[in-house]
Amino acid sequence: MATSRDRLGTLEAEGSSGRQGYSGVEVVLSSDPATPAPLCPHELGPTLLFVKVNQGKEETRRFYACSACRDRKDCNFFQWEDEKLSGARLAAREAHNRSCQPPLSRSQCVERYLKFIELPLSQRKFCQSCQQLLLPDDEEKHHEHQVVGDVSITQLKRPSKLLYPLENKKTNAQYLFADRSCLFLVDLLSNLGFRRVLCVGTPRLHELIRLKESGGTKSNIRSLLLDIDFRYSQFYMEDSFCHYNMFNHHFFDGKAALEVCKTFLQEDKGEGVIMVTDPPFGGLVEPLAVTFKKLIAMWKEGHSQDNSQKELPIFWIFPYFFESRICQFFPSFCMLDYQVVDYDNHALYKHGKTGRKQSPVRIFTNIPPNKIILPIEEGYRFCPLCQRYVSLENQHCEHCNSCTSKDGRKWNHCFLCKKCVKPSWIHCSICNHCALPDHSCKGPKDGCFICGELDHKRSACPNISTSKKVNKAVRKQKQRKSNKMKMETTKGQSMNHTSATRKKKRRERTHQYLCS
């Protein structure tokens, strides 16, 4: 699920920095389990706990917000962690949440699907306006809508071709793999010997695996799709699709869907399964990592203690500039040089002159890179020194002892920085590191918000308790000033009122005297 060019600069800054961008908002991963998170209005499951940080100048205060939406226009849910809600407000929120749920339950969708495939071709219709398969009884309600007729079984097996992509870049970012990218992944998974694929946010890959399985081609791979788009519920049985939010590990259909996923992962004692995920690039790495670790723990439950050191194989498709953040949570991961460029409905990430070299999309995996063969015909070669496939432009650096390029271009070695850098970067003597020629030397720096050191974050700062005390004192002082100003304003207004009353009475006495 890719994102647009106008977001890449922001995302690269966030990915390469030591914190969540420069907005001063961080995810709180360890919330109190005894206090369940509230649900956001559009029913994407439990919210996440965040904290605002302003370089240690103000006391931090936690708040709940939507797990999937980074834009308040998409989901305006906001609640302070310590905020006490009235019973009336809680009841109103619950009623609103119920009104925002999908119109059909999971069992109703399955029941309708079974009826739909039994219909003759002439009666199989799909409403593009409502994004819904229509049964004969539904046609009257949709007679003014844009309806597609003669929906074939082949079309039903490719629902992503029927459904309009959800292209909200910060929430769904549903940019779909082209068949070319999917075929490469399917062939790679097959060559690696996997028999089951857990597709987390990869509906096109799920479709192609199922097509190969049912099409008589040599494929013994099965797949299960976990996706936040509830529209897929009307095309799959319960054992093929689970409505799921990867940002908070929430199964919308409860324990039944959870058991489907668990059974799929633990089949054959967990052997022969891999997870492939393509999250929205605007999503936060931290909650995704927490979710994936929960899926890994679910997979490990089916293992014996002898295999406790094994890892669930994973392909995480994400921009290369998030490498350090991903490896922070998964140290065993490495980034492949393969550039995922083919997204059907994306203007930039397509194969051709404007495609591959501009794509930041890579595959992060815990599978040894020497086992993964990349296509030579697409411009990849095997580096015998690194023991992995790399792009042709990615030259081996004898000083770094590695093929160092991340973006497909030839990088240059900087002897002052003691590492390879992008060809467009130069060494800045003021900043003492390489950067773009027109960079600002006074720009924001990585490291701790409180003390400025680079070796730790704000949450691990030894001065955090002192900072909190100072912030608390500053906050109290501000509160006292505010209260004093209010009192002075009130007092001034009272004195002005008394003075005006006295003047009025004086005028009245003078008037009476003159008239007498």
Curated annotation (Swiss-Prot):
Binding positions for Zn(2+) 5 per the UniProt entry: C414, C417, H427, C434
Signal peptide limits: none
Catalytic activity: adenosine(4220) in 28S rRNA + S-adenosyl-L-methionine = N(6)-methyladenosine(4220) in 28S rRNA + S-adenosyl-L-homocysteine + H(+)
Entry GO CC: cytoplasm; nucleolus
Chain spans, region Disordered: 472-516
Oligomeric form and interacting partners: Interacts with components of the ASC-1 complex TRIP4, ASCC1, ASCC2 and ASCC3. Interact with AHCYL1 and AHCYL2. Interact with YTHDC2.
Function: rRNA N6-methyltransferase that specifically methylates the adenine in position 4220 of 28S rRNA. N6-methylation of adenine(4220) in 28S rRNA is required for translation.
Identification of the protein by name: rRNA N(6)-adenosine-methyltransferase ZCCHC4
UniProt source species: Bos taurus
Source organism phylogeny: Eukaryota, Metazoa, Chordata, Craniata, Vertebrata
